Regions:
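Short, basic alpha-helical nucleic acid-contact segments in DNA-binding proteins
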Residues: 1
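Single, function-defining residue in the core of a domain
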Residues: 5-10, 14-27, 35, 39-185
């Protein structure tokens, strides 16, 4: 079976969701709750999925504790693609706000993984504000303040390994008059 492609690429999207499950002591201990303190706990799982957008099926899914690192799970799922489906075609990964992470961007770029990520206005804020056009390659400098967050973590060596990285920022004008900024490599 020949899969549907976009410009010779498979198109994957990653996303996470919280799902209510039966509230039992075992589920609360194993998966946790997102309920506020002082309210009745509701057991939930955190579900991370990697979805083939054009062929319309889930490639990978992981069940996690309710509050989980969606980007870390997404990276693991992308890393498993060769064993999961035997990827022989180029692909790119679409991610929503909440996924942008400097270490994740660097790891994906180092591995040659193409991505498109919707940014929040606070992501690379100064670079977004300095955009002179709707489509620019921008140098993201790894300043002391950007690196500070990763000091003493597993990502310290990675963010210290370079002065910055080049990323393409694309502004998309929406029908309602708002704009979204996408980051891609």
């Amino acid at each position: 079976i020949t899969p549907y492609l976009y410009k010779e690429h498979l198109v994957f999207a990653v996303d996470g969701s919280d799902i209510n499950i039966p509230t039992t002591p075992e589920n609360l201990e194993r998966f946790g709750t997102a309920s506020r303190k002082g309210t009745k706990p509701q057991a939930q799982i955190g579900l991370g999925c990697l979805y083939d957008v054009l062929n319309r099926f889930i490639i990978e899914s992981d069940i996690n504790r309710v509050k989980f690192d969606e980007m870390k799970i997404a990276e693991q799922q992308v890393d498993r693609l060769p064993e999961t489906i035997g990827v022989t075609r180029p692909f790119f990964v679409i991610m929503d706000r909440g996924y942008p992470s400097i270490p994740s961007f660097l790891r994906m770029m180092d591995k040659g993984i193409k991505f498109v990520v919707r940014l929040k206005t606070s992501d690379f804020k100064s670079e977004q504000q300095a955009l002179a056009s709707d489509d620019e390659d921008v140098l993201i400098k790894l300043t002391k303040s950007r690196r500070y967050h990763y000091m003493g973590t597993e990502n310290e060596a990675l963010v210290m390994s370079r002065e910055g990285f080049l990323i393409r920022l694309i502004t998309v004008r929406l029908e309602n008059g708002n704009s979204e900024v996408l980051a891609t490599n």
